[in-house]
């Protein structure tokens, strides 16, 4: 099997996908913009060959790279970046070279937020009302129906970038003062906590492996206001999340992919959507959850999600991972450089020696993930909450 992996050096934990594929005797061929001599040795060792391009943004360069690798190694069986930013380009390359996997028409369905709505409805999952941002007058008609606040965000975009809460007519006018280069949609505001259904599905859109994360109420506010970020991997997947997530995968006809499906769990009843505790669709992301979340899943479930991915790609089932291991909660806490914290890493390590990771976050991901992060796992949620309290404590706090 020939597998082209796009950008194997970034994010820096993604070499693990290549390494596990190679372990399964896959010919892993990398394309990236990092000079070969600057690649980490782990990335180099996970690849059969690496083709450097000047820019991953240049489709002509990417096309030539794939053509070269196909000429040298024969038919390309898979091409993937597992990165939201490159999903459409991945799909176009698959389409142009007739490579297995989601083609460009398929990917539009799960990268466009407006298209997502129709598939959520098909899956029987409630979804927030929306419209395209067209003019102040037409937007006000929508707001008169759903009330303030409303959320505006690019119809196609990554994470919470360029997402805003419109609280009044002045905010709306201010939004239109800027020349937005891409289509925006406006959604009714949902009061709820964000929770996700993450995992890997097989070639028949069946869940092969899954987990659940619980996030802060607003990633948008974290990005826009440079706030701290904290979220955790749950010990178990709630049944309503599993049921809704499984139906969404079938509705989108997702095959042999890592997925990250986001939902609101309502904290306030919303007419037409649900009662407190019900779930409402947020977004579909057909790639792994961001940052080091795949590693957090590994820590929480005592397994290797990268190997699960490789097994599904190669065998369409899990054969190299023992799924019967103890499960834990796993917390991520991202600190901000602008804040002064009471306890250093050394202080925290003395009390919590089982910290799994402590590093600086790359600048490219820091807006949503913080500048310095801690990842730790716990048998009990109460211990996780105490750890979070210590890590977040500021110098001026009692």
What are these regions (language model features)?
Residues 1-105, 381-382, 386-396:
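ATP-binding N-terminal substructure of ATP-dependent carboxylate-amine bond-forming enzymes
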Residues 103-114:
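A short, structured active-site edge motif that brings together acidic residues
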Residues 112-191, 203-204, 231-243, 390-394:
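Active-site nucleotide/adenylate-binding loops and adjacent lid/helix of ATP-dependent enzymes
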Residues 179-183, 189-231, 239-279, 285-294, ...:
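Phosphate-binding core of ATP-grasp and ATP-grasp-like enzymes
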Residues 276-280, 286-336:
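C-terminal structural cap/anchor segments
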Residues 310-398:
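Peripheral (often C-terminal) accessory segments that flank ATP-dependent C-N-forming ligase machineries
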């Amino acid at each position: 099997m020939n597998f082209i992996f796009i950008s194997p050096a970034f994010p820096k934990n993604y070499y693990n996908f290549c390494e596990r594929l190679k372990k399964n005797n896959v010919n892993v061929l990398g394309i990236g913009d990092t000079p070969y001599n600057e690649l980490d040795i782990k990335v180099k060792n996970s690849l059969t060959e690496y083709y450097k391009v000047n820019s991953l943004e240049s489709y002509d360069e990417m096309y030539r790279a794939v053509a070269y690798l196909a000429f040298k190694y024969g038919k390309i069986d898979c091409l993937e970046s597992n990165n939201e930013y490159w999903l459409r380009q991945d799909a176009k390359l698959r389409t142009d070279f007739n490579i297995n996997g989601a083609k460009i028409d398929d990917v539009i369905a799960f990268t466009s937020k407006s298209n997502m709505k129709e598939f959520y409805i098909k899956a029987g999952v409630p979804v927030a009302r929306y419209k395209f941002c067209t003019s102040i007058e037409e937007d006000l008609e929508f707001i008169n129906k759903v009330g303030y606040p409303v959320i505006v965000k690019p119809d196609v975009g990554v994470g919470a970038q360029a997402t805003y809460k419109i609280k009044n007519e002045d905010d709306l006018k201010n939004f239109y003062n800027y020349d937005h280069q891409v289509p925006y949609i406006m959604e009714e505001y949902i009061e709820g906590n964000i929770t996700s259904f993450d995992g890997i599905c097989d070639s028949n859109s069946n869940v092969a492996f899954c987990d659940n994360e619980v996030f802060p109420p607003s990633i948008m506010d974290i990005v826009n206001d440079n706030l701290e970020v904290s979220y955790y991997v749950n010990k178990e997947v709630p049944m309503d999340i599993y049921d809704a997530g499984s139906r969404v995968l079938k509705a989108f006809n997702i095959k042999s992919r890592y997925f990250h499906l986001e939902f609101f769990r309502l904290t306030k009843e919303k007419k037409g959507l649900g009662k407190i505790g019900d779930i409402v669709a947020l977004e579909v992301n057909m790639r792994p959850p961001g940052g080091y979340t795949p590693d957090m899943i590994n820590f929480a479930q005592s397994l290797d999600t990268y190997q699960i991915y490789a097994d599904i790609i190669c065998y369409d089932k899990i054969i190299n991972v023992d799924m019967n291991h103890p499960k834990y909660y796993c917390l991520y806490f991202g600190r901000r450089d602008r804040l002064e914290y009471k306890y250093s890493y050394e202080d925290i390590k003395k009390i919590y020696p089982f910290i799994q990771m402590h590093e600086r976050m790359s600048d490219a991901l820091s807006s949503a993930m913080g500048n310095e992060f801690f990842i730790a796992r716990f048998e009990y949620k109460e211990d996780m909450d105490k750890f979070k309290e210590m890590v977040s404590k500021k110098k001026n706090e009692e």
